[in-house]
Amino acid sequence: MNKKRIFLLLASIFMCLQLVSCSNGEKMQDGYYTAELSEYNNGWKEYVTICVMEDQIVSVEYNAKNASGFIKSWDMAYMRTMNTIQGTYPNKYTRTYASQLMENQNTDNIDMVSGASSSGGNFIRLADAVIEKAKNGDTTIAVVEVEE
């Protein structure tokens, strides 16, 4: 009789552990996932696209585009102006944020870039959205509301 109780107790514990491990360890599904802001801000709409392979983020693109599709980090005049005033520019800070996501595989330890902290906040929200999409295997574009 005691062996039966011990077996049932161990089986119950094992089943509980399985349920906990399944709910906490969501794996990302292979594919490309994109999130973009819901609106343009100063003429630009920021977006993040990641590529996931074997539960790892293997590439990250973070940028912004205008209504005609022109990419912000390609705007040399904007770069010169921003670099003079802020000490950084889109092609620099977008790569910094993207490389931090690649290294950490999450947004927990993303360091803000001086002069681009607003974009850093947007990046974290966009990256969290694409990671959630990757966990669900949902390749539709996530739309993230612009913070006021």
Question: Where do the model's predicted regions map?
Answer:
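Bacterial N-terminal signal peptides that target proteins for export
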Residues: 1-10
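Repetitive helical segments and hydrophobic/amphipathic motifs
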Residues: 13-14
